[in-house]
């Protein structure tokens, strides 16, 4: 995990670079299916919390692993987690469940990507189809060998569902930037009024 201040700085750089017009040559786009992946894992006793269900942190690690693989595959190199939005735990996961973590790139900026993740569980003692137990949206920044943002290929939504996900990702990005701007303005006002944070 990267230090928070470094991730925030990289996120800021990636978001600013995404908003700016690029003079670099255009990189060919990649369809959503090119990086879509599924990571599967059987949950064991070592994954449980005090209640006997799988610890949320274990699920979050699987989510980050799958999303990181997708971001690296799409960008063609290293990508670091910049933020995680809306991690939702819908149902408990139990020991013995076969968990499938499905991830794909929903949106790309100049050097950042949103990866959408769905978590499904097949109950070991039931013959029912897999149940959705969680979901999350993560933002990754593609980086070069020096840790500086690098350009990523644009994602090319293929289906109507992919197009909807792309549009929803744009809304989340707009909200994320507005929230960050509002917080910075509040902090600046407080400093101007003489408050120490």
Segments (PLM) and residue ranges:
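Extended boundary segments
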Residues: 32, 36-53
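Small beta-barrel nucleic-acid-binding modules, principally OB-folds
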Residues: 76-92
């Amino acid at each position: 995990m990267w230090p928070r201040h470094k991730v925030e700085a990289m996120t800021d750089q990636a978001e600013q670079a995404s908003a700016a017009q690029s003079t670099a040559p255009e990189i060919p786009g990649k369809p959503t299916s090119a990086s879509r992946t599924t990571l599967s894992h059987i949950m064991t006793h070592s994954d449980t919390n005090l209640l006997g269900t799988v610890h949320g942190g274990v699920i979050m690690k699987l989510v980050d692993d799958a999303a990181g693989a997708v971001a690296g595959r799409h960008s063609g190199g290293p990508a670091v987690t910049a933020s995680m939005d809306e991690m939702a735990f819908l149902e408990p996961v139990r020991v013995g469940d076969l968990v499938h973590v499905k991830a794909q790139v929903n949106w790309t900026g100049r050097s950042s990507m949103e990866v959408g993740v769905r978590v499904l569980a097949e109950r070991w003692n039931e013959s029912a189809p897999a149940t959705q137990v969680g979901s999350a949206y993560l933002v990754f920044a593609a980086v070069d060998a020096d840790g500086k943002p690098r350009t990523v290929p644009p994602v090319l939504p293929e289906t109507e569902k992919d197009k909807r996900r792309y549009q929803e990702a744009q809304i989340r990005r707009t909200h994320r930037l507005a929230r960050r701007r509002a917080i910075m303005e509040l902090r600046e006002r407080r400093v101007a009024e003489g408050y120490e944070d």
